[in-house]
Structures are given as C-alpha cells and as structure tokens.
Amino acid sequence: MELSWHVVFIALLSFSCWGSDWESDRNFISTAGPLTNDLLHNLSGLLGDQSSNFVAGDKDMYVCHQPLPTFLPEYFSSLHASQITHYKVFLSWAQLLPAGSTQNPDEKTVQCYRRLLKALKTARLQPMVILHHQTLPASTLRRTEAFADLFADYATFAFHSFGDLVGIWFTFSDLEEVIKELPHQESRASQLQTLSDAHRKAYEIYHESYAFQGGKLSVVLRAEDIPELLLEPPISALAQDTVDFLSLDLSYECQNEASLRQKLSKLQTIEPKVKVFIFNLKLPDCPSTMKNPASLLFSLFEAINKDQVLTIGFDINEFLSCSSSSKKSMSCSLTGSLALQPDQQQDHETTDSSPASAYQRIWEAFANQSRAERDAFLQDTFPEGFLWGASTGAFNVEGGWAEGGRGVSIWDPRRPLNTTEGQATLEVASDSYHKVASDVALLCGLRAQVYKFSISWSRIFPMGHGSSPSLPGVAYYNKLIDRLQDAGIEPMATLFHWDLPQALQDHGGWQNESVVDAFLDYAAFCFSTFGDRVKLWVTFHEPWVMSYAGYGTGQHPPGISDPGVASFKVAHLVLKAHARTWHHYNSHHRPQQQGHVGIVLNSDWAEPLSPERPEDLRASERFLHFMLGWFAHPVFVDGDYPATLRTQIQQMNRQCSHPVAQLPEFTEAEKQLLKGSADFLGLSHYTSRLISNAPQNTCIPSYDTIGGFSQHVNHVWPQTSSSWIRVVPWGIRRLLQFVSLEYTRGKVPIYLAGNGMPIGESENLFDDSLRVDYFNQYINEVLKAIKEDSVDVRSYIARSLIDGFEGPSGYSQRFGLHHVNFSDSSKSRTPRKSAYFFTSIIEKNGFLTKGAKRLLPPNTVNLPSKVRAFTFPSEVPSKAKVVWEKFSSQPKFERDLFYHGTFRDDFLWGVSSSAYQIEGAWDADGKGPSIWDNFTHTPGSNVKDNATGDIACDSYHQLDADLNMLRALKVKAYRFSISWSRIFPTGRNSSINSHGVDYYNRLINGLVASNIFPMVTLFHWDLPQALQDIGGWENPALIDLFDSYADFCFQTFGDRVKFWMTFNEPMYLAWLGYGSGEFPPGVKDPGWAPYRIAHAVIKAHARVYHTYDEKYRQEQKGVISLSLSTHWAEPKSPGVPRDVEAADRMLQFSLGWFAHPIFRNGDYPDTMKWKVGNRSELQHLATSRLPSFTEEEKRFIRATADVFCLNTYYSRIVQHKTPRLNPPSYEDDQEMAEEEDPSWPSTAMNRAAPWGTRRLLNWIKEEYGDIPIYITENGVGLTNPNTEDTDRIFYHKTYINEALKAYRLDGIDLRGYVAWSLMDNFEWLNGYTVKFGLYHVDFNNTNRPRTARASARYYTEVITNNGMPLAREDEFLYGRFPEGFIWSAASAAYQIEGAWRADGKGLSIWDTFSHTPLRVENDAIGDVACDSYHKIAEDLVTLQNLGVSHYRFSISWSRILPDGTTRYINEAGLNYYVRLIDTLLAASIQPQVTIYHWDLPQTLQDVGGWENETIVQRFKEYADVLFQRLGDKVKFWITLNEPFVIAYQGYGYGTAAPGVSNRPGTAPYIVGHNLIKAHAEAWHLYNDVYRASQGGVISITISSDWAEPRDPSNQEDVEAARRYVQFMGGWFAHPIFKNGDYNEVMKTRIRDRSLAAGLNKSRLPEFTESEKRRINGTYDFFGFNHYTTVLAYNLNYATAISSFDADRGVASIADRSWPDSGSFWLKMTPFGFRRILNWLKEEYNDPPIYVTENGVSQREETDLNDTARIYYLRTYINEALKAVQDKVDLRGYTVWSAMDNFEWATGFSERFGLHFVNYSDPSLPRIPKASAKFYASVVRCNGFPDPATGPHACLHQPDAGPTISPVRQEEVQFLGLMLGTTEAQTALYVLFSLVLLGVCGLAFLSYKYCKRSKQGKTQRSQQELSPVSSF
C-alpha cells in the first residue's frame, strides 16, 4: 500500500507542473488535521495514556491548553513519515482574546498554541492556521457594526503572535457558520459583505506587514456553493482580489459525481486564474475508494485543473490510519481503506511490522539535518516557572571533613600516590561547611532560583546508621536550607552523591544488601528533619558513575575494579534503595510535605560512528541503554532492565566459556516496587560520543566489551580542558527528546540537573569565554527541545556554583561559575564571566532579543515628605552644645558599650560608589574628558603611583558584575553618581551622548529589576573639562549649565530614580579643588576661592532643587538633597568654654557652611560670618572674604533639601587656637587646632572613633531640627589588599552600632545607612593604594575580578538582621543555681599578704622579681601589699560583706618552708594559716586552699626551679606538710594555680617571675612537664595517705581563654582557635583529665617544627608509659580560671624561630565592640564563658567543674560605683547559669578577687577587687564597691530571681561597711604647736565647742533686743513693718 501511495503522489504532482511557477514537486500540499477532542481521545487510547482527559465522542475542535498531550510529537512524526506535509490548526478567537481586546490576551493560550505549532515544525509538518472557525468572543456580538475592524485587530494579533511559525493562513473555514453567529442583519448580502470586509482587511494587513518568505492567505468556501457564491459581488471580488489561492470544503458523493463536476467547472470563470486547495475532503458512500483511491483523486483534479486552474493540494484525512501494536509507540500510514472496523483494526495491528524505536525515530528525524539547520539559534524564552540554578556536591565543596563529629567517608582517606592530581585532598575543599552565607550570597548574585546540593551521609550519621545523628551536621544543613529559603531559593537536596560512610564500606558498602536498609533509615531521617522546607529530593546522583568508576574501573572510591559483577550488583542495590526510599516518602511524608522525589541519571548522547552501518546504529542505541537505561528503564518503564542490556549480557556470556557479566534479576514484587518510583527524572549531560559496534572477540570484562560497543569522538568537536568532555551542544537536544520518548513520555517531568564544562588551572581563571559559549549553545538546545520538540523540561542547573574537589582530577579541573582561590586560606570566591552570562540568561528566562520594558522602581522605600527649615540662624555657640554637655562626660565603658537592637522596618541599607572612581572607559563611546581625566594625565598630579581612572574598576563594561555584587550583598539601595561628561561630553545639552545615557539606563533598569533602590548623585567632583576651560565653578554660567544637565537627568531617569543628590561633599570640592589645590582644578587660593565656589555651588543646588520641585516632583514623587560631609569635633577640654566653642565652630565651618543656608535660614552660620568678617577686617580688607546672599537668594536657598544626607568617617579632638592672620586661609579662619587620640584604632587614612557618629547625629538634630537623615557614606580605608578585612568589619560594626544608639536611644530620625564603598576603586590622590571596598578588585588583572571580602558577608548579615539584635543565646536568663552551689571569693598569698620578711618567711621568686628594676609597673612591690598577714579580721569582714560560703586563698611556700625544703618548717608562718582557717571556719566559711600560686622559694629557683626535675619531689614534700598540718581543717585542695602562666610567662617570655626568657622553645615545655608530674605526685600522696582520714578533694586549677575564629568561615582560623585552646588549657588538662599524655595537636605541631628546624626529636618532652598511667585521672574536680575570649587566626612562623607561640602558630586579636577592662589582655566577652564550659564538658568527659577565678580589672580605679565590674559579673555569672542549663556539671563559682591587690607585673595599677583598698592610707582599709553589694545579692539569691515573679527578699541587704583601720600615733601642727593626732583632735573639738557657744550667745542677745524694741513701738500703725522682722 505504501508503494501505491508513492505512485499516486507522483501522478498528482504532475499536475503541479502545468503552467505554474509557485508550486513545484516539493511543495504539493498533503494535509491532515485538525485536532479534535475525539481524535485526541482515540490517540491517547492507542498509547495507553490514562492521564489524558478527553471524552470519547467529543468531536469539538481542540482548544489548546497546557500541557500539550505527551503523545503529540510521536503522532506528528508518524504523519510526516507518511508523506503528510501540512497540518491544520484552528485558533480559538474567544480563548485567545476572552475580553475581545488585543490588549489583554490570554498568554497561557498564546504560549500553548506556539508550543503546538513548534511541535508541528519539529516534526517537519507545516502549520496551516485558521483564524476563525466557530464561537466568537462575547464582546464582538455586541459590536456587529465594527466586526470587520475587530476581526482585523484579532488577525493582526495572530499574525504577530504566530507569524514566525506559520506560512499559510485562512481567515474563515465556514462562512455559513460565521453568518449564523453574527447578529441579525437586513440581508444575507450585507452579512457576506461584512465577512468580505473582514477578510479583506486581514489580507491587506498580512501582505503589508507579515507576509515574509512567501506566506499565503486564503478563505474556505463550500464547493457545492461555488456557483451561488460567485454570483455574490462580495465573494466574487474576494475570490478574484484577496486570496492567494482558493480553498474548498468538498463533500464528494460518488453517486452524484457529475453534479459535483459541474459545480467545480465554475472555478474556470474566475479571473485571474486561481489555484485551488481542497481544504476539507469528505467521501460519504464511496466504498470504491478503498480499492482505488487514485481514481477518485484523478477525477477530482480533472474537474478542477482546467484552463490554468491548478490544484495545489488536498486534505488527506480520509486516507489516513493510525495504530499501535504495543501501546508504547504509534504508527500512522496512508491506506486505501476509508474506515477500519475494530476487528479489522486488530487484525491489522498483528500484521504490522515492529515500529521504529525511540532512538531510531530521533536518529531519522535529525540525521539529515544540515549544519545550518542543526545549529540555528532559537530566539525565544523558556516556559514560565522554569527553574534556573546551580549545583554542588558535598564531598566536592564542603570540606570540614572532621567538623562536628562528622564520620569518615570513602572519599576521605588519603588516596595512594598519583590517584589525584597534585595529591589533592578534600579536607578543606572549598570550605563550604563554614561558608553558608558566602555561597548563598553567590546564588543571590546569580539570581538562581534553585540550588542543588548534596547531604553528606557521614556528616549526619558518622557511622552510617541512625542511632546517633550528629547534631552539628544537622545544624549545618538546617542553616543552609534556612538561608536558601530566606533568599527565595528552592533547595534541591541530594541524599547520596557518591560519599558512602567508610564504616558501611568496611562491611561491603553497596555490595552488602544491608546498605539498602541503612540508606532508607538515613533518607527517612532527612525527610523528617528537612522535609518541611525541602520539596525537591534526589535519592542518588549519577549512580552510573558510582557503579562504573567506583566498582567497575576502580577510578573512584572504594576503588574496586570488577566491571562484570560488582558494578551490576551495586547498581541493583542502588535501584532497590531508591525504590524503597521513594515509596517511604510517598507513604509517610508526601501527604504532609507535598514534595517530589526523583533520581538524577547521567548520560552522554550517542550517534553511530558510521551512520550507513546498521550495526553501528544498533550499538549507539545499546550504548544509551547501558548508560542511561540501566537505571532509567527499571524506574520509568517496567521495573526491569532494558531488554537490550539483558540480551547483550546473555549473548556475551554464551560466547565465553564462563559468565563474563552477572546481571542480577528483580523479583516480580521488586519490579512493581521499582516501576514508576520517581516523580521526576533528573538528567545530567556534558558531552556526546560516536559509537561503533565492537566484535565479541574477548572474554575479558570491561564496560565497553560487555556492551559490545566502542566509543569515539569527532575530532572537530571542540575539546575542553577535560579529556572526556567535547563540546557537542546539539547532543543535549537529541538526548532530551530520547528521554522524553523512551522514558518519561510526557508523564514525568525532566529536571536538567547537571550541565557544564571545566577550565584548566593554566587557563584564564576569570574570563572563561569558552564556558560562556558552551552554556549559550547548550542552553539554546534545551530551549529547542522544549519549544520545538515539546519535551517537558522543568529546570536547567549549571555545574557548578563554585570550583571544588573533582575526584581524581583534584583541583585541576574548574567547573565553577565562581573561581575559588584554593591557595588562600579564606577560599575566596570570585565570579567568572560565565556567572554574569548565566545571570543574563536567568533574567531574560532565555534568549530575548527585544528590548526589556522599562521597569518601575521598587516601592519598598518609604520616602519622607518635604521638610521645613528654620527661619532664624543658629546661635554662637549654637544650642547644639548640649550634645557635648550630654556626652562628653560619659565614662568610656558607658560610651563604648555595645547596644543591641534593630532599625525601622523600612531602613534603607545601601552601598556607594562614584562615576570617576569605578567606571573607567574614560574616552569610550563618545565620553568627554573630565577635570579628573585631565588632572591624572598631567605630570605632577601627586596621585600615588601616577594612577589614573582610565580603567578603574571598568564598571562601564562590567555592569553585570556590579549588579551581581549588589544582589549578593542584599542591599536595598545603591548610591552612584552620573558622569556629567559621559552624558554631555561638552557639559552642555547640545552634546547628548546616547551611549552614556544607555549605560545609566541599563544600570538603573538592572537595579530596579533587582529590587534595589537607585540613589543618584548628579555631581561627584568630575566636572567636564570643557566647562573648566571656561572657568568652571567660578563662572556664573555653570549654575545654568548644571541646571540644564540636572533637568535632563530628571527627565530621562526620574521615572525610576526617586532619590537625588545634587552635590557630593561640596566642602571638599571648594577647599581641596580651590583652596589647597590638591584636587583638580588645582587652584591654590585658600582665603578667597573656597568661599566663592561654595557660594556658587549653593546657588546651583538651589536652582536644581526648584527645577525638580516645580517640574518633576508631582509626577515622579522623589526626594532631592545634597550629600554633606564632616567629622565629629570633640573638645579637648569639655569643661573649657573656648574649646567647646572651637568644636562647634569647626562643625559650622564644615557642615554648617552648606547646611545652614539650606536647612536653616538661607544664609551662612553667624559664627562663619563673624569670624571671616572680623579676620578680613583685621587683614585690612574692605569687605569680608565670605560672600553674602541677597534676601531674595536667601529665600530661594532656604529649605532646598528634603532630607539630610551625611558623609562621615572619623573624629577629631579640637581646641581653640589663635592662628596667623596672613596669608588668609579658610583653615585659619576656623581658629582651632585638631588632633587624634593615638589610642584610637588606626586605619590607612584616619583613626576610628565610632562614638563620634552618635554625637554628630545628635548635633545635627539639635542644629537643624528633627529632619530625616541618611548616612550616605561611611567606611574605612585599609592598605591590606586581601579579602580578610577584620578591621573593616570592626569599623562598620562599631559605627553602625553608634548610629543605632542614636536612632534607638536618642530618637534621631535616621532613615538609611550607605557604606562606602561597594568595591575597591580609584581613591583620588591615593590611587589604588587605599582600599575601601567591601569587594576586593584585582587591578592587576585586565578582567578586574571582584571578590567578596569578609566585611561584605558581615554587612549582608547586618542588613538581613536590620541591625544588631540580641542573639537568643545572649538573652539574659533568670533562674537559680542548683542547691549546694558553692559561692566563693579568691586571693593569693603574694598578692595580699605582704609581711615579706616577717616571722622567718623566706624569699620567693616574686620578692626577687619585684625588687628587680623595670620588672613591675611603677616599681611596685608586694612587701606590704594588702597586709593581710596582719589583717585576718579585716579580710573576714570583706568575705562576710560578700556572703560567700567559701574562700579560696593560697599558701606561701616560702612562708612555711623558707628554703623550700622540709629541713626547716617555719611555725610562725604555719600558725598564720591556722589562725586564718580557724577564723574562716568560725564564720562558717570553708577554706579552698591553693598549694602553689606562683611564689616559688628563691632557694629552689637558684637550683633551676621548675626546670629542675627534683622540684617534683620538693613539691610533694611541701604538700605533705600541708596535708599533715592543715588537712583536718581543709577539705578542698588545689595543687597548682594556672600552670600555663607559670610555664609560659615565667619561663617563656620572662614577664613573670622568675623572668626566664632565653629558652622560649624549650624551657616552657620542661617546666610544664615537671608541673604536671608534681601535681600528679601530690594528688597520689593525698589520695593514698590522707583521703581516707581527711575526706577532702584535690585537683588542679587550669586557666584558659576561649578562642573564637577571627573569621568563622575560614577553616584555618577555625583550626587556629582550636589550637589556641589546646595549647593553653589543653596543655595541662589533656594529660590529667584525658589520657596521661599531651594532646595530639601539641605533639604533632611541636614535633614537626622541631624536625623541620633540624632537631632529631621534639622539643616537647615525652612521658613514659608508667608516667602516663600515673598522671591520667589525677583529679577530683576541674578547677578552672577564666577571664576573657580572643579572636584567633593562623600565623605561620619561620621554622628557625623556636618558641611556644611559634609552635602554636596562632595570633589573636579582640573585637573592638567588646568592652575594655583595666588589663590590655582582658575584654569583656561573657559568651565565651558558656562556650568554654561546654567545651570542657565535651572534651574531658563531663568532669565536676569549679570556677576558681573569674573577674575583671579597672585601671587606676577610684570610683566605688564600678558599673563595668557589675556588668562583667552579671553577664559572666549568667553565662555560667546557662552552662548549668546546658547540663555542664558546674559546682561552684569564685570571683577574683575579694579585694584589690598586687597584680603581678602591673603592680597596683590594675584593680580586680570587689573591695577598694586605699593604698594611700597606711591602714589599707577595704571599702566595698557597688560590685560587692551586687555579688552579695547574687550569692544570697543563688542566682537571678525572675523580676516577673515579684520582689525577692534576697535582693535586699544591709549596707556593707568598710573594715576598721588601726589608730596610728602621728604628730601634726596645731596653732603653732606640735601635737599628737589625738591631742590635736581634742583641741579642735574644744575650739569648735567654744565657737558654737559664742554663736548661740550672740543669737540669744539679738533675739532679746529685737523683742524689747518691738514692745516699745506698740502704738505704731499695724501696717508698718519692723526692720528686723522684714529682714
């Protein structure tokens, strides 16, 4: 039958040659269609598609709706294979334009029809589109009179929407049906005329505007009505003039053939001669056609094709039949039968040959494509809702291989040599474990909508099983998922990406059936834990790779090479694990979580090496079944492996004498479980292969030999840096179509989950143009698959977000859109060119060529309304002096205390830049030169390194890069300036540069599209040089020119820009440009020009303001101001009025110079006018150098700003100064001098003084009223070029916090904060040497790559939090400590006892040290100290004031044993401690005794001290004396206090006694070694001899700071922080509390450095095994001293340096926001207390802990109201309470110290005491400070009672009193006599009494006199007052 139809078509085509030049044998039309619901129902039944919702018997025309039926591509392809050339598509006018208007089309319907048309085009069927068939829009029925116009509009819409896909159009398919729809008209003729007019209009529109490439338009007429219709003038004219061919609806009744021929003959009467197309052919009652269809067609054509009338095609539906043999594929063919009955159809199916496979159909469809057709670029967009994203894998990027208890994975063990390039490992990788915020910022910069990442199984379950999940691991993924959600990014979580826990691999891994259960448990935990937020799950990522490379070739872990057995077994278990996991989710989680679970499979595309060889074609298909079908077929088809794969393995095994490959079999139950066990098919694809058939000539198993194929590549395919990836973009389209036809069949969506290519390390690491081309071509092929092939692809996910560890390739292959600097410890990420390109694709959702619509600005910013200015000037000095009165007396602690809170909800967070500093392109695209271009190109400009802004950051060419940064930062606003000379090259509006305008339009549109608010500065110092050539700002014409430029900007950009600033920092423009001449134009006229320039600038600003106000404000609704700059001025002596006035004057001369005229009264500040006027007069000038405004100008200037924009960076200390008069100078006019406090932190340009910001904001409010304020610049310049910029973090942290205080505490109306600057740039005279950027710019790289600094991440965090809210963990906790909690206070013998030589005491090393010059601050000594040796009673009072139950003190070794040995025991000294202990016990205070607190007897030091191993025995003997003599009274012993300090400070750096510093690399370790052994011996002595009888406890007190990493996202810093704590606290704790030996960190570091320095062993001594056993466990509790926290970071010392610090390799700093103390090393960091207590719990197996010291110092303290100490104690003790809540076994707390004392090398300068000791009073009284009362209340309350529960009695206490001072006999002078103090006091009292008596006597006499006088005047008038009484 196929052959007969070929003959028919050849015969019919012969008609097309009869006298026509339009048709040829190639374009004879054979058409099918249209789609009807009935047809779709039948087709869906044929294919077994139960998802289709078509009703049987519904013959209505199909109205397009999404999604298209999945079987259509297959149906259309079969039609094409049957010689069908065209297909009819009926549009639905009513559905496309439901409202009747082309302004509101139904876009979904439009897109649906486009997909349908593209599907036809893909199948090589040409669409024939009918504009209207039936059902008019309701709106047209009410407007009949305009029907023709309405139809014309609709036709125009259709031509525009679909014309690129359609070549043949029909206006109407049934005129009679349309007439029925029209409202009643007078006559049929008028109805026909209406339709004719509508058709004519459409025809004319089409041929005038849309008929490109030979498009045609017609109308369909019924054949039987031809004679009648041709008599109607409208139709006759239509047929002659307005059709390209005539179309007929023909019903051919074979019984009445003659009648039809007669009617058709009328066609010959039409002139000119027409071409005829049989649009619709019906053959009722024609059984003969089944036998001979050709005869029927020939008879029809004979009737038509006469006299040059030509038939160009016909409808072939009557001869078409479609069938299916397997419900998997469809076949359509032309048949002689008119209609097959059901029984006939079944017979037909059984006799049909097997249909072509999906692969064969795709190959046939594409094999003959021309290169031009194959590579044709499709300009279109992806469907709405398409997901764009990037991917990573856990083992590729996370690092943190041992963090948080993570278990070892199979990728973790170091591989054998040469396994990975460069011996790369993944311990750190890209360090994503610490960089969640950074990675999410990258995604935000990309505008990604989905992020595919994998979960590390061993990070969740370290041993692979779910008995004990790792909480830190769970927290990491929770943090990542939460951050993604906050950023609006969909998480796609992969459960398994090749990194099996090693613990499971040790039991066989994926070859052990039990791993399926383990995986299911792991997956179930992930679903339960993360599934509330994760809605896209991937069970396995590329299981083929794991099976092939991990178990087949052994290239990947676990390194098993068994391709015939292991790889198939592993795949088998993976599939079962996947299926069980999917069903578990489906049953247990889907109902609540509504997520989707799929699998990601990888596949190359395969094509035959020799297309003419059928065996190569079959091998190509087999390749796909082996690679993709191995996993896809069981899941997506029938639950089993592909038949091709099974057959091939069976054949292979038959050919060999033994089984080469063993393919496991699924049970029927397993098949049912597998089938359909995926909600989507994830696909990753990178390249294509050419495949040839491989003869079976070997029985050695390999992947290729088992598959029977051989892989090749076409060498013309471009090669990437990876040997296995060639660029073959069209392969992805074909693969997607194959997947759609073979597996998903439109029922399951496809997620493209991996596509990309690597670049090599030797390539340009930032300009990856090859990858850009790769993405461009591959993504476009995906678009073709969706649009032209109707493949249901839902996502495109690029591989990968960042560079990572690439398995065997190590780090040599870079797949990242972002470069990772693996040589930098911060693992900084920098976007590549491909990242920006990918963003552009995402923004356009594909490939748009049309210009984007202009966007409206984001409406998230609440702009203030216009504000009123004052009408009167500020006073001199201004009333703002109250700011100094309020703040200058603040204590430093109060001033600097960090405040927690947030800003207003609509607070505007931004970053800033300026045109000249970043744009570059100085002469590009018609830009004119500016004064800065001229200045930097002029020799001698004094710009460092002769730098210019010619390129700068190249922002003019890197707009995408800048927008990427802004999105990543999450800023709400971007402040930038417009280059006047880029817009107007000559400065005048007659020279508009369209390229410059376009740049700013694109910038503004990009900002608005990213929801970032543009803040635009019109002038940022870069005046067009052409205007400078006419005098610049000294020329009055500049005011008009500036107004013209501004007007243009308002008009051009104002629809999107709502925040304008006229000038940036005009003070610097005036002074630096025209005063000092440092800036261009370089005028040096300091006394006159600055004032003139400022005068002009103020007037120019006012002019522009009024222009905006009058012309644009009402429509654009923006605000306009100018950015003013100043620093804060702090009076050097706040109590000296002249200094306060000088500070105020400085502010008026800088800020008030411009702010006073604008925000107050239109004129300069009086202080300026006064000073400049007076000095001008003193300089003998006729008038003031300060110009004056006219009254009219004042009115014009006043109130010309809507908000106050402030730039501020630093502060100065100011005092009054009388400067020289001549030469005149603006600087001297201020009559003040400035300086900086050297203690302020230094920067590259100025010292930081953040507290000045708060004061400045308050001053502005006082001076200018409660006006909305925006900080438009604030930042810090550093010379450090690296991405680590902790100092910048501190700067922004403290400055923003001061702004927060101003907003929250002072009521300042602060609306926004804009950081300077977005990125490093050209910093004026500093060139590129000073870096202000949150982003680092590499100016040595032509690509100017931008890399986020640590400060960028911090600033994003501030923005996200909208300030600095108190973290939940830092909130104050109300509660009580456990019953029995011990409260104590501490001291130490040498620090308080004094009596250094009393009663036989021997010398200690501290006696010697303090008597040595230059050892102790202020030459202080401890000879007397607090004299506690003589003041037991007074010390008891201090303890009773505190209410403590315990007192920790130390015993002086040299007071008990003067020479350090037991040869002589000093009973007097011993008796002191007996009396002290008895006194304590009598007061119910328990002693806690420290045996050794640093004061070694000097005699022992003389023989080496702690470096001499004999000290161990000496210490044991000394302890024995104490146990024996005091043990019955003392039940709490501490052997050593802070051995770290003894070893490190005493023997390392020599800053403490004994001052040894010449052996820093060995002595500390030897001393530490002996200290540990001495402790152990003392402990064993007590344990063995005394514990049973005395019942006490004994341990050691170890001190340690807590260490936080300086950069928590930097693995090196994290490890440095750990190392800091292990070298400090762990040095001594690890041997005693853990295993008897030093920690591995110390041992490894010191050994490695010792060997590197040439030593043959470690400098750290080793314990013998017996010593380890004796040391281990020598504790009853953990005594712990803690004061502060540090920020630690890695610091590598040269190996030649031998010291403890060099071994530790850590540097430390303090956060500037941490409150200071009196000690340089002690910052108040309460949070660290809780953290280190928890660390002790975890590290040392939860020992009982007693805090044996904690407190804070104040330097030179005299105020008893020690609020800082109260803050310290309150917060630290509260953190201890939280630790108790954390289940830390904390038993007691000891405050350091009970009273001020001798603080070692700082002498008496630092005071830690809760009692003030007055050292200037010989009696040394102990006076309680406020902190003593506070601590006593905590002790009484045993914590912090909740005030919400009411007042608590424990909070009330009697006032504590000072201790009683002894009476001393001294002589004093009294009335010229030398008397004792007692006698002088008595005499004083006597004299005082006599004076008092004398005064009383005089008063009595006066009273008597007055009374008597009054009585003598009783006769006087009552109205007269007595002089005395009135007095």
Curated annotation (Swiss-Prot):
What PTMs does it carry? N-glycosylated.
Q: What is the effect of changing E1273G?
A: No effect on lactase activity. Decreased phlorizin hydrolase activity. No effect on localization to the plasma membrane
Q: Which key words tag this protein in UniProt?
A: Cell membrane, Disease variant, Glycoprotein, Glycosidase, Hydrolase, Membrane, Multifunctional enzyme, Signal, Transmembrane, Transmembrane helix, Zymogen
Membrane-side (Cytoplasmic) residue stretches? 1902-1927
Write down the Gene3D superfamilies for this protein, in alphabetical order.
Glycosidases
Q: Region Glycosyl hydrolase-1 3: list its residue ranges.
A: 902-1366
Segments for region (Glycosyl hydrolase-1 2): 362-855
Coiled-coil ranges from the UniProt annotation: none
Q: Which residues are glycosylated?
A: 42, 368, 418, 512, 821, 934, 946, 989, 1174, 1340, 1508, 1656, 1672, 1761, 1814
Expressed in which tissues: Specifically expressed in small intestine.
- Key word Hydrolase present in the record? yes
What the entry lists under Pfam families is as follows: Glyco_hydro_1 (PF00232)
Q: Name one GO cellular component term.
A: external side of apical plasma membrane
Q: Region Glycosyl hydrolase-1 1: what ranges?
A: 44-286
Region: Required for homodimerization and transport to the plasma membrane; residue ranges are 1647-1927
What are the start and end residues of every segment in region (Disordered)? Answer: 1220-1244
A GO molecular function assigned to this protein is:
cellobiose glucosidase activity
Its recorded reaction(s) are:
lactose + H2O = beta-D-galactose + D-glucose; phlorizin + H2O = phloretin + beta-D-glucose; D-cellobiose + H2O = beta-D-glucose + D-glucose; quercetin 4'-O-beta-D-glucoside + H2O = quercetin + beta-D-glucose
InterPro entries with a match to the protein in the record: Glyco_hydro_1 (IPR001360), Glyco_hydro_1_AS (IPR018120), Glyco_hydro_1_N_CS (IPR033132), Glycoside_hydrolase_SF (IPR017853)
- Residues of the active site: E1065, E1273, E1538, E1749
Entry text on domains: The glycosyl hydrolase-1 3/region III carries the phlorizin hydrolase/glycosylceramidase activities.
Q: Which disease is it linked to?
A: Congenital lactase deficiency: Autosomal recessive, rare and severe gastrointestinal disorder. It is characterized by watery diarrhea in infants fed with breast milk or other lactose-containing formulas. An almost total lack of LCT activity is found in jejunal biopsy material of patients with congenital lactase deficiency. Opposite to congenital lactase deficiency, also known as lactose intolerance, is the most common enzyme deficiency worldwide. It is caused by developmental down-regulation of lactase activity during childhood or early adulthood.
Family per record: Belongs to the glycosyl hydrolase 1 family.
State what this protein does: Broad specificity glycosidase of the intestinal brush border membrane that hydrolyzes lactose, the main sugar in mammalian milk, to produce D-glucose and D-galactose. The mature protein is composed of two domains that catalyze the hydrolysis of beta-glucopyranosides and beta-galactopyranosides, with a preference for hydrophilic aglycones (in lactose and cellobiose) for one domain and hydrophobic aglycones (in phlorizin and glycosylceramides) for the other.
This chain belongs to the protein called Lactase/phlorizin hydrolase
**Which gene is the coding source of this polypeptide chain?**
LCT
